[in-house]
Amino acid sequence: MLRVRIVGRPQKLVPSFCRLVHRASASTSDPWNSLISSRINTNKDTTSAEKNTVTGSSTSCNSSTASTDAASSPAGSLSGTTYIAKDNIVTTHEFSTGASRILSNYRSPFDATVVLLLDAAGSTLLGKSNLDEFGMGSSTTNSHYGTTLNPLYSVEVETGKAHISGGSSGGSAAAVAGKLANFALGTDTGGSVRQPASYCGTVGFKPTYGRISRWGVISYAQTLDTVGIISDDIHTVEKVYHVLDKYDDKDPTSLPDDIRNSLKSKCSEDVNSTSLTVGVPREFVVGDLSQEVKEVWFSVLSQLQDMGHTVKIVSVPSIKQSLSSYYTLATAEAASNLSRYDGVRYGQTTEDLQEKAHDLIVANRTNGFGPEVQRRILLGNYTLSSESGDHYIKATQVREKLVNEFNQVFNLRHVFSNDTNVDKETSGRCDILVAPTAINSAPTLEEYHQQNETNFLNDYVNDILTVPASLAGLPTISIPRGKHGIQIMGQFGADQTVLDVSKKLMEVK
Amino acid sequence: MIRINSRGLTVSTRRFQTLSKIGSTLKTKEDIRNALNSPVWSLKELISSNEKDMKSVEVSAKTINKVLKLSAFDTNITAEQEKSLVSALSAQMVFIKHLYENDEKSDSVVEENDTHFRLIASDHNPGEPLTLKQLLAQIEELPEKVDPAKGETQGSFNVANMNPRNRPFATIRSKQG
């Protein structure tokens, strides 16, 4: 039976993790023991483990406390720190599910490069966090393991006061907001690190596309997927970024060392952090922004002005077409990437005997993927089919146009640019762009479902503020302002500029 | 941007009419407030898939069947599921139509599809072409470059370990009679 639904209520709500987070941060003096032990218990029970937002790591969770583990971890710049990885980042010691039924029994034969780098730097992995299945969603409600609620709000689902954590890295953001670990890894395809960080009141950093290795990251849309870092401490985010900012020959999209070195010298020359030009893209001034979001945006721009920086209005017209481009590329790439899951060599396979090999694959895929993933695969295959037109190519052209428009706005020449005309006159251009992360704070579960029952595109268009930086691969951070987030965007490769400005802004919060 | 054609790989830069611009400086707090209170568009424009637009997209039962097959999903769906699917594909097409705004021609079929913009360094700054000698030397070096982490050595990936909850083999029953 095909399960295609335009709007899907979560199959089951699993507030237990969030209740635990909420209780831990509110009243328990040592929340770690109870949380870790509960994870160990659920990990032993593989059926109920599937209901948890965090699955335990057998390597790091079998001692009495996390701090004992962290203290005995190898020396390095992250020695003594703990972290949680989004469950689309593969590890050898536990299942790597992508929050999908089809991978619910999958154990990777290798560790992701990011996990190995953090291990070498002395950080301890505590567990894996929930996500929208394969990263497809903005709410962490599209998961085989249930919904992750937002620990900043009440988690009483019955009262209608529970709020979504955002997504798709909602489990990572909720875990950080609940003080479970020093930081968490997420992945950001169209805003999946920044938006949940904003909803959960934490910092979420999406570095430049290609900076951090994607080896061992379960692909959703490979031209956009970027590993990101979530923490409530900007200095921790920066330290983790420096550990992960390495070329990896296993990842063909990794930025080569010569480009990294060239960026290092350019960024240190070009940016005078005491007198920056800050751009406000007028296409981000949409009528849908809440009054609170506008107030927060105003307050941050005012702070930057008071710090001596120049604030300018800029125009990047292709931002208006960015969502159409993004959802064409992302669904097409998803249809291709997810075609590998057939449940034959690995992954969930049906117990029912099938007459043909083809029937087995159809049964596994139909039962293995959730409704939103099925819809995106179907949309992707339709978009790529001859019936609909050559939209994928058109979407890459809009993407290229957007990159060129950003190049006209930024001071720093794009490291890939070989068009000298673009860079003749750079005076008066911007060092950073500033915009809100989301058009409003986290909605309640009820509001979220009501909105999407009208039209599933409602969920897609809310990504308007985060998708342009994803399409252009720009380093972008979301820093918290209460229950909202503000994005600082830099030119491709100017990650350090983005971090430096964020540190200053967080000092004067 | 990398272009693949009959003459091999070439790098080219597409010329766009660039419309981005740096506007005025927001000198005072009042200027900032005014700028943020003057919206230039609304997201509703993107989802205002009015009936006329939706109806202009034709998605037949045959197309639905084809897309389901392409996706390796069960084609045995109810009429209600089919209706939902037609509606989803139509909404996606109305959404995608915004890609063609500001275009002189609205034809969605392109004559050339050998260009593909990606944010990959070698697409924009390809290195020197390899000589035959270098290529052969690379092939010679391959045996030393195999990586167990990529499953490139015998036994480095064990299927049974990857599926600890599953029986290691799927069984397909042959049709009786």
From Swiss-Prot, chain B:
It catalyses: L-glutamyl-tRNA(Gln) + L-glutamine + ATP + H2O = L-glutaminyl-tRNA(Gln) + L-glutamate + ADP + phosphate + H(+). It is an enzyme of class 6 (ligase). GO terms for biological process: glutaminyl-tRNAGln biosynthesis via transamidation; mitochondrial translation. It is a peripheral membrane protein. InterPro entries: GatF. CDD domains: GatF (cd21422). Its EC number is 6.3.5.-. GO terms for cellular component: glutamyl-tRNA(Gln) amidotransferase complex; mitochondrial inner membrane. Residues 1-16 form a transit peptide. Residues 153-164 have a biased composition (Polar residues). The keyword Ligase applies. It is found in: Mitochondrion inner membrane. One of its GO terms (molecular function) is ATP binding. Allows the formation of correctly charged Gln-tRNA(Gln) through the transamidation of misacylated Glu-tRNA(Gln) in the mitochondria. The reaction takes place in the presence of glutamine and ATP through an activated gamma-phospho-Glu-tRNA(Gln). Required for proper protein synthesis within the mitochondrion. This is Glutamyl-tRNA(Gln) amidotransferase subunit F, mitochondrial. It comes from Scheffersomyces stipitis (strain ATCC 58785 / CBS 6054 / NBRC 10063 / NRRL Y-11545).
